[in-house]
Amino acid sequence: MTRTITGDVSGALADLGILVPLTAALVVVNGLDVGSVLLIAGLLVVTAGLVFRIPFPVQPLKALTALAVAQHLAPDVIHAAGLEIGVVLLVMSLTGLATWLSKLFTKPVIRALQFGVGWLLVVTAVKLVLKPPAVFVHSPSSRTGLLLAALTVGVVMIAAWRRWYVLSIVLVVVGVIVTLLVEQPSFGGPSIDLPTFSIPPWSVFGTAFVLLVIPQIPLTYGNAVVGVSDLAHQQFGERADRVSPSRVALVCGLGNLVSATFGGMPMCHGSSGL
């Protein structure tokens, strides 16, 4: 496998395509603290790299985020869901259930789940363009948004076909430049605002489980436990010997417990980032 600086930098940006829009939605629509969210996410990325010793994705939970944004759920509900998902994944790992169930997930099942996650993101993105939340005060027209989306998808498909891996770097740079030119944001001075430990009130755990955890767990296990393990071994061979469904579930479970209690967002190891 030939490595280049361009390839490494481009690969390092892979998760941003999922991380940035979903994080922005949870912060703007649901009121999560952006500092806590980004700090915890960064720590989980570093931890995943140290544990698995290969490039390993860390992303927000897609179905959970889509449902939370659509229903404008409060931060306490989202954090409660993160705790519950963390506990479920830990139980699956420590009891051996994660390994046993992985035998039932054949490649067609894994690919179908990955397709479903991708389709969910497409539908959510189109809804945000056609009917943006009221908090998006400077939203472009739906026609402009759909045109930009179609253009971007076309460019990405051509780049993937031609193997222009530098495209992710270009897209990020262009996005930053366009944002600075269009919005002309103001910059404040630096400040230190560390996350604080907190537990959501017990009254929200039932709501979180029904609305967010039940729809998310099958996708998380299929795509971000079994799917990412299968893809890691396919892409990295022997270098992925640390990756297994049980270990991925363990790391993801612990990560969600930490994230939920320190103001972060529910996370997973979605295979799309790998």
Q: Model-derived features: where do they sit?
A:
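Short, amphipathic, aromatic/basic-enriched membrane-interface segments that mark the entry/exit
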Residues: 5-12, 28-32, 49-55, 132-144, ...
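Membrane-embedded alpha-helical modules
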Residues: 72-187
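Membrane-embedded helical hairpins/re-entrant loop segments and their flanking transmembrane helices
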Residues: 2-6, 26-47, 215-274
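Helical membrane-embedded segments and adjacent short helical loop/helix-boundary regions
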Residues: 6-18, 55-57, 103-123, 207-211
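Transmembrane helix-boundary motif of multi-pass solute transporters/channels
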Residues: 10-73
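Hydrophobic, small-residue-rich membrane helices and short re-entrant helix-turn-helix hairpins
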Residues: 5-6, 162-173, 193-200, 209, ...
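Hydrophobic, membrane-embedded alpha-helices of multi-pass small-molecule transporters
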Residues: 6-7, 14, 141-152, 164-167, ...
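C-terminal ends of transmembrane helices
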Residues: 45-55, 89-103, 153-161, 225-234, ...
